[in-house]
Amino acid sequence: MAVISMKQLLEAGVHFGHQTRRWNPKMAPYIFTDRNGIYIIDLQKTVKKVEECYDFVKQLAGEGGTLLFVGTKKQAQEAVKEEAERCGMFFVNQRWLGGMLTNFQTIRNRIDRLHELERMEEDGTFEVLPKKEVAQLLHEKEKLDKFLGGIKNMRRLPGALFVIDPRKERIAVAEARKLGIPIVAIVDTNCDPDEIDYVIPGNDDAIRAVKLLTGKIADAILEGKQGEQVAE
């Protein structure tokens, strides 16, 4: 059975690209036509590409690999968090901190600090400290949790990235490319597909489109994990 249907893609508005004046010519192979100054993405190609990405992600999870979901634009934040948590993977949905991959050890130190503050809150340490100090520590914990909460259990670099809007997440894409980490991405008509290993041509601005495609990637992880359990 197909991973995704044309009907699902149409209903979620995955076919709506950007305005024709804001396009990347490298996306031409994925464009079906233009209508009223907006590019329409060829959904037959999207169906095929979703299947390729699904297979890659399923295999990754089946081999015990991890996927980092990245989407910091408003339309993506909720779907990224929900779907990553649903399939037990990691996510960044607030702001990509430079060096999250290329300087991972420093980031791990900040994560260790977050774990330390969480322990202090749980084991009663906060109760014996002055109120002012506790307020400062809680503020520090909230800030760390906001930016690093989605990767706080990521002990090592991820096996791959799933990115919504590689143009917006260009720092994440550059870091992954530098380290040779494969990238799966929803790529709209204004993005450069050459930087992405597994391209899903589609609308990266509509919440429903983002939710649908992100959900399929999470499904692939869950299916791959089941295979991993069977293999064991």
UniProtKB/Swiss-Prot annotation:
It comes from the Bacteria. Keywords: Ribonucleoprotein, Ribosomal protein. CDD domains: RPS2 (cd01425). InterPro entries: Ribosomal_uS2, Ribosomal_uS2_bac/mit/plastid, Ribosomal_uS2_CS, Ribosomal_uS2_flav_dom_sf. SUPFAM superfamilies: Ribosomal protein S2. Belongs to the universal ribosomal protein uS2 family. This is Small ribosomal subunit protein uS2. It comes from Desulforamulus reducens (strain ATCC BAA-1160 / DSM 100696 / MI-1).
